[in-house]
Amino acid sequence: MSTPQETQNQPEVDANVSEAGDGDSAFDAERFRSRAESTASITSSILEYRTIRGRTYQTSKTTEYWYRILDVGTGTGIWAIDIADKFPGAEVIGTDISPTQPSWVPPNLVFHIDDAQLDWTFEPESFDFIHVRYMQGAIDDWPKFYSQIFKFLKPGGWFQHMEPDIELRCDNPDVKVDDKHIFKRWAQLFYDAGDKLGRTFKFADGSMDKWASDSGFPQVTHKKFSIPYGGWSKDDNLKALGNYTGYYLDLSLDGFAVYPIGQVLGWTLEEVQVLVAQMRSAVHDPKNLTAGDMHLVYGQKPKST
């Protein structure tokens, strides 16, 4: 098991943001709305795949590609679209249980409506690269999931898996964060819900490394990145990243909490809304310098198995 390689540095704070009285200035929301609102709905022909015994079966293309890439849990398909644009000679497949992908996509990209927890129906050893991210709380059996990654990679193929640490932190040393702080309480509630569901939200404990190693990957690399939430950093790149992550989190907090905390832990809607409001306020508070860790694990299947 590898030790995470740290990439954290002491944050430099943009005074214009950190001294603002309204944390909203840390989130440049208008920049991202146009792209979100332009997302088209998925075509009816793709939706029809659900009627085939609840499974998706895609007709194989006859064109030969140099690379074959699988994006598991593709969501809106944004990563798959970007990678298909960047590598037009590759065949890219995105899978997700929900039909939230757009209809306008590069010609070398297809989406399958599929449940990644079931046995995958692709040809074994048929992908050069398998990409996974943001699947926290979505998988019952991670060892099985990783064994499928290994099974469907070609010899010499690579996988990459990225998950955020659900416990955010304050990068301001003057802010006290104890067990009563909303960042700690928020994370613990998700840990409790995950334990009850049998679907973990914990990815900072080296579990991804172990799953990969146990499935057959001989050498696994684990990198940990610190990312800001909000535009408080003085570094231009981190400021832009913080605006993206802050906006994404701002839109997602309600959706994150309703099922695991409301349905699984039995909180009322009003209680969940209060919790979300507290979390949103803390993330927006410029004094907190809100940040979090992103865990990236990757490895290569042996060229001969």
Question: Which role does the model predict for each range below?
Answer:
Residues 2-67:
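N-terminal auxiliary segments of SAM/dcSAM-dependent transferases
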Residues 56-57, 62-64, 74-77, 97-100, ...:
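Conserved beta-strand elements of beta-rich interaction domains across eukaryotes
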Residues 69-124, 129, 144:
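Class I SAM-dependent methyltransferase SAM/SAH-binding core
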Residues 126-134, 160:
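Short SAM/SAH-binding signature in class I
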Residues 137, 158-252:
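Conserved catalytic/acceptor-binding region of the Class I
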Residues 139-141:
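Short N-terminal helix/helix-N-cap motif within the alpha/beta-hydrolase-1
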Residues 143-160:
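A short glycine-rich, Lys/Arg-flanked "PGG" loop and its adjoining helix->strand segment in the class I
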Residues 215-305:
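C-terminal lobe and adjacent flexible extensions of AdoMet/dcAdoMet transferase-like proteins
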